[in-house]
Amino acid sequence: MTDSKYFTTTKKGEIFELKAELNSDKKEKKKEAVKKVIASMTVGKDVSALFPDVVNCMQTDNLELKKLVYLYLMNYAKSQPDMAIMAVNTFVKDCEDPNPLIRALAVRTMGCIRVDKITEYLCEPLRKCLKDEDPYVRKTAAVCVAKLHDINAQLVEDQGFLDTLKDLISDSNPMVVANAVAALSEIAESHPSSNLLDLNPQSINKLLTALNECTEWGQIFILDCLANYMPKDDREAQSICERVTPRLSHANSAVVLSAVKVLMKFMEMLSKDLDYYATLLKKLAPPLVTLLSAEPELQYVALRNINLIVQKRPEILKHEMKVFFVKYNDPIYVKLEKLDIMIRLASQANIAQVLAELKEYATEVDVDFVRKAVRAIGRCAIKVEQSAERCVSTLLDLIQTKVNYVVQEAIVVIKDIFRKYPNKYESVIATLCENLDSLDEPEARAAMIWIVGEYAERIDNADELLESFLEGFHDESTQVQLQLLTAIVKLFLKKPTETQELVQQVLSLATQDSDNPDLRDRGYIYWRLLSTDPVAAKEVVLAEKPLISEETDLIEPTLLDELICYIGTLASVYHKPPNAFVEGGRGVVHKSLPPRTASSESTESPETAPAGAPAGDQPDVIPAQGDLLGDLLNLDLGPPVSGPPLAASSVQMGAVDLLGGGLDSLIGDSNFGAPSASVAAAPAPARLGAPISSGLSDLFDLTSGVGTLSGSYVAPKAVWLPAMKAKGLEISGTFTRQAGSISMDLQLTNKALQVMTDFAIQFNRNSFGLAPAAPLQVHVPLSPNQTVEISLPLNTVGSVLKMEPLNNLQVAVKNNIDVFYFSTLYPLHVLFVEDGKMDRQMFLATWKDIANENEAQFQIRDCPLNTEAASNKLQSSNIFTVAKRNVEGQDMLYQSLKLTNGIWVLAELRIQPGNPSFTLSLKCRAPEVSQHVYQAYETILKN
């Protein structure tokens, strides 16, 4: 008979019967009784009253009965800690049993009983099991150490178990090695500062030897451990890669992904000129392709990981486009992921093939998939310039189908194509206008309105078209209302005599009849601009917009590097670092790739890609910065925790492109009516000077100005939150960067009459993802008139949202009295990283590659420094002089710097000896940064 019979009873008074049976002299009856107890426990009945009777059954030679009793013990020991001590003697005895299965069972159960009271009794049996002659017992004991460490870390360290665990890495049995590595990794993860896994070439060699012989899960533990090792040079990295490569052909997909992670990390250290590098690239493709023949759930995980790999090294899969073509029976989540990878791999060589596929997808029945396919065609046009004409033609064919949702998506993406290729495809506007009546989705209506407003001079009846939208103004979404307001103002500036009545009508609707503050604000801005200075209004509203970037929503480079280190884990599926979704007090280690060798810089790497925004795949409307209370009130400001504050899991980290073209100009972007766009018509950064190109090609002959480091400039503390606004709490502070770490140096003063305790701090989302790296620790209560100084470490892995101004930081501080809010501006130079020195050839190539429109020129006045002093001072704040020369008595410093999010800024600083005015020319793919970089230059040089 099967064990199902134990689950069918519903008798009353069963506990008493079970008690009698458990104390029976007959072994069979006793075993039956224990089975009934376990069955009752499994279905949720409380059988804890039988604890002493069940524990008495431990004294048996029957392995099955012993397992059942141990199962009961694990479940009820926490609720009956005093009774659990009764079992200790049996554990000690079982750990010396001649049967290794019983010894292992005892030590496994010991680790699972999470009761502090009995842990010290278990140390001696565990010590014996760690040195047991049987490898099965040793491997079980290794895992037990990690479990015991979780309950009482200090006890494990005092008893020397960690050293024993390290010794097991040299064990002769590969499974013991794997479990020891797994246990040490688990402990090291929860205690990042412990430096437990201090690997060296000898121990790495032992791990690689064990790798070939242990089970698949043991291999995963070892591979994950190898991924945390930093080889001393490229030769060692290559040696490890050679020994890990055979794992790529393993049947278990988890082993394959762990091997890919190791290879992706160590490839950073290999020179691209090596034959082995090319061989490795070829070997990586087949296993990744094989993963796509698994069941859909595994395919999805594989595709999310491949998405990261393709962003980091597109060359691995550039010839494998066909495997990402969608199959008719793929689930929607697999289809959408494949579509995204197809766009990432699209190039001039395969674009015809890709477009043919996308056009076919656009005729499918799944509406969501069709929409994505139409958007993908637009993204291809923006990414591969040579295909733009064919893409536009394909989109027009789709518009002719008159399928409503296809037409609407096509109009949205054509608007982006107009932005990317101005004055090239405007001939299709007439076709678009024919479909005005069928548009019912806000995004499509807003896109069409933008097109009409932007090209009003080419559309004869533009005023009639916009007037038709105006009739139902109050019924439109905010996105459409904002876009309509801007479009009519553009039309008025282009045809003032014919549209005066129309512009007055829309301004009246926006400012007097609307309850929406964003709409009212924008209406008032336009009204004042038009009434005070129509010429300025024209310069602002009709300013030339920067081109949108050809990069399609790449993950920000530093985040991408971190996610590559988490291939095969949940982080690689969410595309978020673990600290964004893992709760609890464990320390979070931020992993990063090893530094690249000089010749391994990938030309296709996002590191060197323009810092552009998503062009085709539209981000959601960015929420308003609003008043400071808005977002900050929703932040979790609970008591301090031992780990860094966690970002809300709903925030898509890394998905917001910070400074790229998609956000450059809110006029005409997909984010129509984003509330933060109340100054949507802000002019594009003007070109403030002619491009300084003369003599740049001589850079190879120049000598580099290298200065000595004297520490990054630190501004004096300023009052950020006066006491009168914070119920007696005054907060002053400044920002510093020392040895690569950013800190917020705070001074808290209690000017109230009561003691202040329970401090906590949280930042709102901001342009560079600044976030506290640790809780705000005020170790003693802050008494009246007492001041305390705190250095709060910061990191840049928080949630990203473009702020206005760019360096605006909104902060919430909580104590036992209330929650207080303030905002401050952080100096951009604290974000300048230490590896911001570009080599000369790269500098020259990048300078030429960045469009002249992105160049800005500034004057720095009243600066008494000579050239060498200026260079040294700037270098101490991570602005590096790449080259220096003298032209007609004028010193020219060519400099580079890099921000924490991977954006490079190139500079030319002209210094005329004896003249206190310097001329600074800046070039950057994200022009919004230039003004703040200039301010950093001025601050550093003048202080």
Swiss-Prot record:
Chief location category = membrane
Q: Which residues carry this modification: 3'-nitrotyrosine?
A: 574
Report the record's Gene Ontology biological process terms.
basolateral protein secretion; determination of left/right symmetry; heart development; intracellular protein transport; kidney development; melanosome assembly; platelet dense granule organization; vesicle-mediated transport
Pfam families under this entry? Adaptin_N, Alpha_adaptinC2, B2-adapt-app_C
Any one GO molecular function term: protein kinase binding
Subcellular locations according to the entry: Cytoplasmic vesicle, Clathrin-coated vesicle membrane; Golgi apparatus
- CC terms in the record's Gene Ontology section: AP-1 adaptor complex; cytosol; early endosome; lysosomal membrane; synaptic vesicle; trans-Golgi network; trans-Golgi network membrane
| Keywords assigned | Acetylation, Cytoplasmic vesicle, Golgi apparatus, Membrane, Nitration, Protein transport, Transport
- What is the membrane topology listed in the Swiss-Prot or TrEMBL record? Peripheral membrane protein
Q: In which tissues is it expressed?
A: Widely expressed.
PANTHER family recorded: ADAPTOR COMPLEX SUBUNIT BETA FAMILY MEMBER
Q: How does it assemble?
A: Adaptor protein complex 1 (AP-1) is a heterotetramer composed of two large adaptins (gamma-type subunit AP1G1 and beta-type subunit AP1B1), a medium adaptin (mu-type subunit AP1M1 or AP1M2) and a small adaptin (sigma-type subunit AP1S1 or AP1S2 or AP1S3).
Q: What is this protein called?
A: AP-1 complex subunit beta-1
Q: Which organism is it from?
A: Mus musculus (Mouse)
Which gene codes for it? Ap1b1
